[in-house]
Structure formats: C-alpha cells, structure tokens
Design a protein with these regions (language model features):
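A cross-taxon signal for low-complexity, glycine/charged-rich
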Residues: 1-3, 11-12, 17-18
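Membrane-interfacial helix-loop segments of redox and metal-homeostasis proteins
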Residues: 4-6, 18-377
Length: 377
C-alpha cells in the first residue's frame, strides 16, 4: 500500500478494515486537520478579499478617515471568536490550555516589543501577513515580496541569526504568572473555574459585539457584519478541527487556529523542501488563504497584476515585512494570531502582544514615527 492510501474503510455493515475497492475510506485525524485547514483558509481568503478584512485598514479608516465600519467588523470577529472558543472549552470539546497562548511562563516585555515591531512593520508594508496572502491571490506582486521577506525573517528569528538574541531577551525577562488568563484571574478571586470562564467570556464578547452593532453604518453594511461573523467562527473552527476532530492520543498535534507568522515561514520552507517537511494545519491554511483569494478574484473580475512604483516603495515594503517577521515571532503571533486566535483564549500574554501591535500601528499611523500610506491594499 502506498503512503498516500488511507489505511481503513467502513463497509456497509459497519466493519472497519483495510482499503478495498468500493468501500468508503475513513479519514484519520491528520487528514481531517489538513482538509479542515484548507477549507478554513480558503473561506478566510475569500472573505478577506470581498470584505477588505484587515486590522490596518480598520484602524486607518477609524483614525484617519472617520469610517468606523471596518473596526467594527474586527471587533465583531473577536467577540464571536471569544464566545465560540470559550463555549468549546467549557463544553470540554477543546483543551485550549494546551495551546501556546496559555503558557504560565512568558516574557511580557519581549511580547510587547514584538507586537510594537509587528504593528509598525504592518504600517510600512500596508498590511499584515494574512492581508498580503489575500492580495497576492488578487495578483498583487508587491505582496509576494512581503510574504517571502516575512517568512525569511520569521525563520531567522525562530532558528537563525536573530534567534540567539531573541532567546537571550526572553531568558532575561521571562517570568511565571500565577494566572495566565482573565478567567484564571477571576478564579483566583474566588469564583469557580466554570463561572470565571463564562463570566469573562460573556462580558468581553458582549462588550465587543455591542461596540460593533451600536454603529448605525455598520448595521447597514450586511457584508461587513457577515465578514465579522464568519471570521470569528473560522477561529473557533480551527480550534475545533485541531483540538477535537483531529485529536489523536497516539499522534498528538498542536491545538491551534488561524495565525500567519510561523505558518508562512513553514509554508515557504515546505515549498522549497517538501520531501523533508510535513504538512500541518498552519501550512495548509496559508495555501488555502491564497487559493480562496485567487479563486474569488478570478470569479469576480478582481484579479489584476500589480507591481512596485519605485525602488523606495519596494524597500519600505520589504523593511516592514522584515519587522513583521521578527516581531511576530517575538510576540508569538500577528494581528490575527494574537488579535483573534490568541485573544479568543482570553490569555493575558495575547492581550499584551495585541496591545503592542496596536501601539506599533498607532505609532506608524498617528505618532511621531508616522509614515504615509502606500498603494498596496
């Protein structure tokens, strides 16, 4: 039997056995995760193209243009992700405590600093990693440079030349928290674990959803409402796929959801060294986002090849991608990985990293380090 065959089947009488002609194959946990990642990424890519879902565009529209619809879309996505993820955890379907976001030991300064770098780099490149994948699918060749440079600097920070510096910074500032999440803080105040989880999730998700829907223009934008709902559910879908559908005691996989720093770096490595690499949820999500955007762009007539206007434009965009790659690794995620997926766990570390991203973005859009927009979105 070849390595690509699925080694089991379900017969008409319910028996399970070896692969046979005419029988229905049974997907194992690994294959379920791969297919789920492709589907989730595809939908995210399509929604991202149609709605313009992007933290940078949201903040720029809110702060500079007075248009608060996109930031409400992002807030709704976070609120839905928090509610759905915490319901999965409360129901015992997914153990989010196994994720990288809920570690008891982390470096607050490094995560915040990484967020600052990522946020400022996002302004320089005029979009985050996930947005670059969406734009690449639409034919934006500038985004190809962003994706490749981001991947290279992420690998350099994870395992390469920058890694020793990162490790030294973490080692000098790492601390162990008695509570690593908002529910844990409430539980420390005397609430039961379940009550603490439900209270924290209810208050935070309700506040975000109310913030979204009190805006009249947002309520009159069904496309933006749908985008926020779908993206929030995609985050929960990723948790469900890796933490429940793909759970396997004999072949455990990381419990995770949408994020676009290490996965973009891993995807580039897989493209170059596929015989020595293994597909995982993050890699196929990256491929799925590109495919979803490409198919949607072709079907809707949005596909158009675009390039850089000047060498300076390319240098600035590539520099921003480098900051995003290095900063995203230090922050353990990006505007999606920490701003949506990490935030959905209510982890304190994710909130610190996301705060850094917001401050870095503000510095680029409004602060002393302000830079003008580029035509890359």
């Amino acid at each position: 039997m070849s390595s690509t065959e699925i080694p089991s089947y379900v017969s008409n009488d319910g028996r399970v056995g070896g692969t046979r002609s005419g029988e229905v194959p049974v997907l194992d946990g690994g294959n379920i995760i791969i297919l789920s990642g492709l589907l989730i990424g595809f939908v995210y890519g399509s929604v991202g193209l149609l709605s313009g879902f992007c933290l940078l565009s949201s903040l720029r529209g809110w702060w500079a243009d007075g248009d608060g619809r996109l930031i409400r879309t992002y807030a709704l996505a976070i609120g839905v992700a928090v509610a759905a993820t915490q319901l999965l955890a409360a129901g015992g379907l997914v153990d989010i405590g196994k994720s990288i976001y809920l570690q008891s030991s982390f470096s607050m300064p490094v995560m915040f600093f990484g967020g600052l770098l990522f946020g400022y780099g996002m302004v320089l490149s005029n979009g985050c990693g996930s947005r670059a994948l969406v734009l690449l699918g639409r034919g934006n060749l500038r985004s190809f440079v962003v994706v490749v440079v981001l991947a290279i600097f992420a690998q350099m920070t994870l395992k390469g030349l920058i890694a020793p510096t990162r490790i030294a910074m973490v080692g000098a500032s790492q601390s162990t928290a008695t509570a690593n999440s908002v529910p844990a803080l409430l539980a420390g105040a005397g609430l039961s674990a379940t009550a603490a989880r439900m209270l924290a999730a209810s208050v935070i998700s309700a506040a975000l959803i109310i913030f979204a829907f009190v805006h009249p223009a947002f309520r009159r934008s069904p496309g933006q409402v749908a985008a926020g709902l779908v993206v929030g559910l995609l985050v929960a879908g990723g948790w469900f796929a890796t933490g429940y559908l793909g759970a396997d005691d004999f072949n455990p996989v990381p419990v995770t959801s949408l994020t676009f720093i290490a996965p973009i770096a891993d995807a580039l490595q897989y493209v170059m060294l596929s015989t020595g690499s293994t597909l995982n949820f993050g890699i196929v999500t990256v491929f799925g986002v590109f495919a979803g955007s490409l198919v949607t762009a072709l079907l809707t007539g949005r596909f158009q090849l675009e390039g850089y206007r000047s060498p300076r434009h390319m240098l600035r965009s590539g520099g921003g991608a480098a900051l995003m790659g290095a900063g995203g690794v230090m922050a353990f995620g990006c505007s999606v990985g920490q701003g949506l997926t990490g935030f959905s766990t209510l982890a304190l570390a994710s909130m610190i990293a996301f705060a850094g991203i917001l401050f870095g973005t503000a510095a680029g859009l409004r602060g002393a380090l302000r830079v003008g927009p580029l035509a890359t979105a």
